[in-house]
Amino acid sequence: MSRKHKAPIRTVLADPVFNMVVVTKLVNTIMLDGKKSIAQNIVYSAFDIIKEKTGREPYEVFQEALNNITPLLEIRTRRIGGSNYQVPTEVSKRRQQTLSLRWLTNYARLRNEKTMDLRLANEIIDASNKTGGAIKKREDTHKMAEANRAFAHFRW
């Protein structure tokens, strides 16, 4: 991998329904093989299911779920003096959002419900209630960071 240039950060347009960039990013993480319209249908029908099940505004539930999933620390492997150390580092805001959306979609895909929109809706509801696979992933990441706190002075 070339280290010459850093990839430019492209701006993401807000989605047409909620007018929020985060929802577009969710659509983009759900999207497979460039089929964006299918991904949008999945996300919007998942939001309809959330409204139906909780009776609350779906974007608020989604935002609450993201806040619960967002990691504050992560582990980075660093090689020092011939041995590898798991160094806990703080996560940047941009990466926090990326990781939380990625975990949300990955654990939604692993669920056993019949359709993807139902899986996504239930994973978002679970995450807003501080349960589910994505929350477990965040807790495991924080536990690993806490366990390797002794190596925090290797941070770069």
Curated annotation (Swiss-Prot):
One of the primary rRNA binding proteins, it binds directly to 16S rRNA where it nucleates assembly of the head domain of the 30S subunit. Is located at the subunit interface close to the decoding center, probably blocks exit of the E-site tRNA. Transmembrane segments: none annotated. One of its GO terms (cellular component) is small ribosomal subunit. NCBIfam families: rpsG_bact. InterPro entries: Ribosomal_uS7, Ribosomal_uS7_bac/org-type, Ribosomal_uS7_dom, Ribosomal_uS7_dom_sf. The keyword rRNA-binding applies. One of its GO terms (biological process) is translation. It comes from the Bacteria. The keyword Calcium does not apply. This is Small ribosomal subunit protein uS7. GO terms for molecular function: rRNA binding; structural constituent of ribosome; tRNA binding. It comes from Mycoplasmopsis pulmonis (strain UAB CTIP). Part of the 30S ribosomal subunit. Contacts proteins S9 and S11. Belongs to the universal ribosomal protein uS7 family. Keywords: Ribonucleoprotein, Ribosomal protein, RNA-binding, rRNA-binding, tRNA-binding.
